[in-house]
Amino acid sequence: MTTNLRQRMTEDMQVRNLSLLTQSSYVQQVSMFARHFNKSPEVLGIEDIRNYQLYLTNQKKLNASSIKVAVSAIRFLYRVTLGRPWDFDEVVPSPKKPRTLPIILSPEEVVHFLGCVTNVKQRTILTICYAAGLRISEAVHLMPSAIDRQRMVIRIEQGKGRKDRYVMLSPKLLQVLIAYWHAVRPKGCLFPGDIPGQPITRGAVELACQAAHARSGLCKPVTPHSLRHAFAVHLLEAGTDLRTIQLLMGHSSLDTTARYLRIATSKVCATTSPLDLLPRPIPIPIDAKQIEPSPF
């Protein structure tokens, strides 16, 4: 991608107030697209885009989420920056993402996992991800001024979609934050990184999460986002209504929040199986006392 085209695309994203993370991602994706053909995107057309999507799918074996990012970047370039009059749903189709369910940690597993995070700063960040349902990018960019102990809320500024919101400040989380403050005495950012004036990186927290997961011995996968998922499901199972959870998590659509209804087990477990309603028990061919212990 030429310097002029990169500059034009960046300016188009800036005037639309896209986040810096989105801008960086889109420029990277379009640059990879151009390098694949060793040509400027200005001379590439519909068939080239189709071939690139097939390359990402069949040769690179990328998942639908990764391809979706590439497609969004290419769509922006050709629709906005280059102004191509195409039917983009037809020309640059976005892959359908499989409706998979995240694996949810139980409350006991959350306690155990957080206890395995040895660094106080990283443990505090991951605790906030669970206690307030924050994205990792939101947690690492918190400033001390975001903690409002008078109103017992945390102000999340410019979250995903450039939207501000408030989340609850748990009394227990407040005590964790106070203890962290006295232990670390951070300057500027609440969670400063190695570069003066800059917050800790997402990568550093993700590495700490991986190390804690290895120490914990948990079979379930754990990422910072796993704690956000657990926040939503545990609230839902405790009786919090879906609209409140949507506001706390900063979801634009209630449909995004509604997927947690498929994960919450409180209603599932409270539903009686028809097997238990049969008039007589079904025969069990093996004496359960004589077989080896089962894995469940």
What are these model-predicted stretches?
Residues 1-296:
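Conserved catalytic core of the tyrosine transesterase superfamily
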